[in-house]
Amino acid sequence: MNKTIANAKRLYRLKLNQTLPEYKRFLYNEVLHDKSQILGIYGSRGVGKSTMLLQILNEMDYKITQKLYISCDHPMFQDLSLFEFVDAFSQKGGEVIVIDEIHEAKNFQKEIKLIYDFLNIKVM
């Protein structure tokens, strides 16, 4: 699992190197200041959900080692237990994780419920 977390962090750093637009979506401040442990955002393709979440993750007051972005449509996450991955990240000091394309993950509803029930980490 350590190798998977290291690879996910590397991919996140690559994502951070991409230029994000300065424009903020109308939900930006509401999502940024939301205190819920689990926050889901859904909508049509191409409307800016992923971009907004990356902008928010960048602005959150956590060290880079405490936050992570993953996309479940990446082959690395195909057969991975989200609960086990998030648990391992949390044990390494993770405080917040953005899980994009979560519908691509196996049993994602059950995995999110387990994260909510047992882990102390913010998931968007």
What are these regions (language model features)?
Residues 1-124:
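Phosphate-binding site recognition
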